[in-house]
Amino acid sequence: MEYEFRRNSLTGTYLASFSMDHEVLGQWFSEELGPELAKIQQVLDIIKDIQAGKRDSWRLIGGDLTLDLDEEQARIYANALGFEQEYELEESMSLYDAESEAYCGLEDLEEALLSWYEFVEKGR
């Protein structure tokens, strides 16, 4: 999983871009976490708790995206994917799941979060 972090010098906005099949992670980092160090640290602490066996799983529901963690992996997905549809959408109208959902290993997410934390901290 490859990623790149940038900061817009004019607006001060932090942006994360992730490799194909993980694009939604970039959106989650940029929009749901943003430059909030306390929120980033909270997720890192939860990952440590899961790795230590203190928790089995954890969920963080954001404005547009949700993070699910368990002992093996992280899943980030658009909140719209979590709802069952009462009717069938036309094929051309269906959500493009690859850009709305991604899985990665817990350790991979932890590494990316640590890098994001350092990037944001240096940019202040």
Curated annotation (Swiss-Prot):
Signal peptide: none annotated. It holds the Pfam family UPF0231. InterPro entries: UPF0231. Belongs to the UPF0231 family. This is UPF0231 protein Shewmr4_0656. It comes from Shewanella sp. (strain MR-4).
